[in-house]
């Protein structure tokens, strides 16, 4: 079974044809770049030093239709977001029509304050709005419960809350015209060997959420993780494997701790 799964991942990787190194890349600054993934879409990649993790890249999405653009996730900070917006305005003559974050973390909406100062409309899951308000963060303007459909001209943007995973409020964005799925941080790149930071997530619900994503977006060709290289549907399968790995690890830790609690005092003393 494991060999079949590995083969499936390899096949999907080849079929997706997503080799990040072969894509047009625009380096805006040392901490910000754009990667063209379709005629109408770019991934913006920003870098920040995160305590305990080092210098980390984070992915966001830009959908373009004629002279308008929609932003999904900001770079890490207001200052990086300002650089991105100014570049889009200055080099592509684009108007930012709206913004929606994947969830409440700074790698998704760290630049929301700047966008609000610019008068740019913002949308988010109601769960994200509630958390942002509680944590005294900038609060997106308009919320939705289960789903939201927006339009950028004739291009349709579909947003869904399908359950907790990396965070309790994470959503997925689907762009049918481009066959682009942006599940953000709930999905891991193939280079990821673990789930990373899940302190604000739900490991129990994680697999079910990813399975709902797989079932709902069977025609997705481009899948954008929150961090690391872009891929295809194989990223969803890879993430489920990482969740299972984490759950086994958690189970072993729980079992070990439980054994210590029931261990005779004399034996416990000998162990330490």
Where do the model's predicted regions map?
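Sec-dependent N-terminal signal peptides
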Residues: 4-13
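Accessory terminal helices/loops
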Residues: 15-27, 204, 208-272
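Metallo-beta-lactamase
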Residues: 21-31, 36-37, 68-69, 76-77, 126-241, ...
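Conserved beta-strand hairpin/beta-sheet module of binuclear metal-dependent hydrolase folds
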Residues: 35-85, 173-183
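Divalent metal-coordination and catalytic microenvironments
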Residues: 40, 63, 73, 88, ...
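Acidic/histidine-rich helix-loop elements
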Residues: 44-58, 132-134, 191-200
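Active-site metal-binding motif and surrounding structural segment of the metallo-beta-lactamase
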Residues: 66-70, 79-123
